[in-house]
């Protein structure tokens, strides 16, 4: 696949990794970032994660990656309703996002909810990794109104950066990830709440692996 302009809203770990993955694989001609944090924006441009940072999505964007907190996804999608490019998010919970979009934009045609099951205990564009999605699974939970061409564009992009794509409903996704991702995080945070300094000399590899989730 070859795109003209990729717009990334939120150039942190995931957004930055999307930019690096696309650039390193020659998938796009230009990467534009929308990043409110001035330090992150400067670092991303200086280090080639994106080509430029602007204040709004350019009209000629061919694909829009929405890498913002889940509660900000729906407002962004609604704001971009008149844009022609496919839009995908990267949130780890899909049901509330889909419902919020459908309430306001009942004919949403180019929004493709996505969840790349990949990440790191690090954050920010400094942690961006062009191979972050290599071998990972990306779940697509398209709306009933999502256009097939938008869905296929997003699926092809994820496959081009090394991911395997699966499709399921938002409810199926959320039920599965509650067990495989959110519960382990909850347990790790609860466990860390019981650890004191006196325990640290008595830890080993299992402690390190388990607590990494809560880092």
Task: Put a short name on every predicted segment.
Residues 5, 29-30, 110, 137, ...:
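Residues at the starts of beta-strands that form the adenosine-phosphate
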Residues 132-213:
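Internal alpha-helical scaffold of NAD(P)-dependent oxidoreductase catalytic cores
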Residues 39-40, 72, 94-97:
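Conserved short alpha-helix immediately C-terminal to the canonical SAM/SAH-binding motif I
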Residues 1-56, 63:
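NAD(P)+-binding Rossmann beta1-loop-alpha1 motif at the extreme N-terminus of oxidoreductases
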Residues 34, 89-90, 114, 141, ...:
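Generic beta-sheet signal
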């Amino acid at each position: 696949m070859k795109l003209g302009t990729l717009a990334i809203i939120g150039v942190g770990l995931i957004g930055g990794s999307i930019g690096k993955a696309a650039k390193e694989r020659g998938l796009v001609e230009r990467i534009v970032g929308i990043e409110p944090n001035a330090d992150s924006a400067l670092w991303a441009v200086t280090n080639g994660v994106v080509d430029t940072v602007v204040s709004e999505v350019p009209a000629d964007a061919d694909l829009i990656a929405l890498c913002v907190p889940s509660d900000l996804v729906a407002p962004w999608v609604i704001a971009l309703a008149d844009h022609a490019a496919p839009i995908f998010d990267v949130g780890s919970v899909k049901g509330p996002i889909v419902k919020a979009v459908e309430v306001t934009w009942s004919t949403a045609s180019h929004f493709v909810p996505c969840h790349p099951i990949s990440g790191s205990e690090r954050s920010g564009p400094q942690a961006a990794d062009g191979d972050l999605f290599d071998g990972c699974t990306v779940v697509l939970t398209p709306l009933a109104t999502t256009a097939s061409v938008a869905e296929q564009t997003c699926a092809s992009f994820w496959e081009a950066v090394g991911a395997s794509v699966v499709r399921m409903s938002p409810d199926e996704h959320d039920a599965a990830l509650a067990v495989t991702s959110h519960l382990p995080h909850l347990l790790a945070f609860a466990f860390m709440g019981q650890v004191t300094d006196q325990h640290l000399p008595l830890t080993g590899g299992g402690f390190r692996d388990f607590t990494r989730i809560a880092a």
